[in-house]
């Protein structure tokens, strides 16, 4: 199992819409998350001192090929449709890698 932390901005005028979407995630999206070996998935919201709201996600990956599982998720028509509602709410960080939407974070501490 590998733990992942990721961050992305959220457009201030879209915070309530994003929260509404995630209060009722589509069942097929949840099934795809499970099918792609993601467990214990949470998203947190916080407005920082710069006034910008950010989303922090945490999940545990239990599969053997993260890239293949993420490609499987990205190819799923229902997931693509879900993302078409979520992405306009998000504001990617300027310093993200070319292939990133959410920015990966470095784990600096963990305790069970």
Locations of regions flagged by a protein language model:
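Active-site-flanking beta-strand signature of metal-NTP-handling nucleotidyl enzymes
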Residues: 4-9
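An amphipathic, aromatic/His-enriched active-site/gating alpha helix that lines ligand/cofactor pockets
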Residues: 36, 60-101
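Short, glycine- and small/hydrophobic-rich beta-strand elements in well-ordered beta-sheets
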Residues: 30-56, 60-66
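Short amphipathic alpha-helical segments
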Residues: 14-39
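Charged phosphate-binding loop/patch that engages nucleotide di/tri-phosphates or the phosphate backbone
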Residues: 96-112
């Amino acid at each position: 199992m590998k733990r992942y932390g990721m961050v992305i901005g959220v457009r201030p005028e879209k915070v309530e819409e994003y929260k509404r979407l995630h209060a009722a995630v589509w069942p097929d999206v949840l099934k795809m998350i499970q099918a792609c070996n993601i467990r214990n998935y949470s998203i947190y919201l916080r407005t920082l001192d710069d006034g910008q709201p950010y989303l922090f996600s945490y999940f545990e990956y239990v599969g053997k090929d993260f890239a293949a599982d993420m490609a499987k998720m990205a190819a799923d028509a229902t997931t693509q449709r879900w993302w078409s509602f979520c992405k306009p709410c998000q504001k990617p960080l300027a310093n993200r890698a070319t292939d990133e939407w959410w920015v990966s974070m470095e784990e600096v501490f963990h305790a069970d």
